[in-house]
């Protein structure tokens, strides 16, 4: 009988020690995660001036282009037609930037001939201007980034932007198909 009582006492003590060790290790692991989390936050604070969007700008509520911009650390994406009118953007006040960038591209195209893109290095950012032809429309994609984009990223970004623009243009063609021609003639 004494052996059973001693066994039970030792068993309970062993379980309590095991649970105590488990909670101690768990507490240490959480402390380690907290330290790592604080280090990451500090490092992100150091990186913020280099990749964070400008706080003085107002962004649109359209999430298609904003999602692309966030996934590639891009500040702004503006798509304009050949007249400089904004088609899609991540900014609310992109009219002036879009018109200026499209005219810059046209001016450089007159000087240099057949060009694929224009890259302007500003004080703290890069401005990329790409020509794009979609459904017979001449468009310009203007990308502002605090980091330089490599060629692979550029192609991926332009491919995703083209996918978003196809949604916009498919909506327009669907609307045109739904409106009878008599209604168009009366306008």
From Swiss-Prot:
Transmembrane stretches, start-end: 3-23
Keywords, ordered alphabetically: Membrane, Transmembrane, Transmembrane helix
Subcellular location: Membrane
GO CC aspect terms: membrane
InterPro entries linked to this entry: Roadblock/LAMTOR2_dom (IPR004942)
Membrane topology (UniProt): Single-pass membrane protein
Domain of life: Archaea
Name under which the protein is recorded: Uncharacterized protein MJ0163
């Amino acid at each position: 009988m004494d052996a059973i009582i001693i066994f039970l006492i030792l068993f309970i003590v062993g379980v309590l020690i095991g649970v105590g060790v488990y909670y101690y290790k768990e507490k240490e692991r959480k402390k380690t995660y907290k330290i790592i989390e604080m280090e990451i936050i500090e490092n992100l604070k150091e990186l913020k001036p280099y990749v964070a969007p400008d706080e003085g700008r107002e962004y649109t509520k359209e999430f298609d282009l904003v999602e692309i911009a966030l996934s590639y650390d891009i500040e702004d994406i503006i798509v304009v037609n050949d007249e400089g009118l904004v088609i899609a953007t991540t900014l609310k006040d992109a009219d002036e930037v879009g018109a200026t960038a499209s005219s810059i591209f046209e001016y450089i195209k007159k000087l240099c001939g057949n060009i694929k893109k224009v890259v302007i290095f500003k004080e703290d950012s890069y401005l990329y201007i790409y020509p794009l032809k979609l459904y017979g429309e001449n468009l310009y994609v203007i990308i502002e980034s605090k980091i330089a984009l490599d060629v692979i990223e550029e192609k991926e970004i332009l491919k995703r932007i083209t996918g978003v623009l196809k949604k916009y243009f498919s909506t327009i063609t669907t609307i045109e198909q739904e409106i009878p021609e008599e209604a168009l003639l009366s306008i």
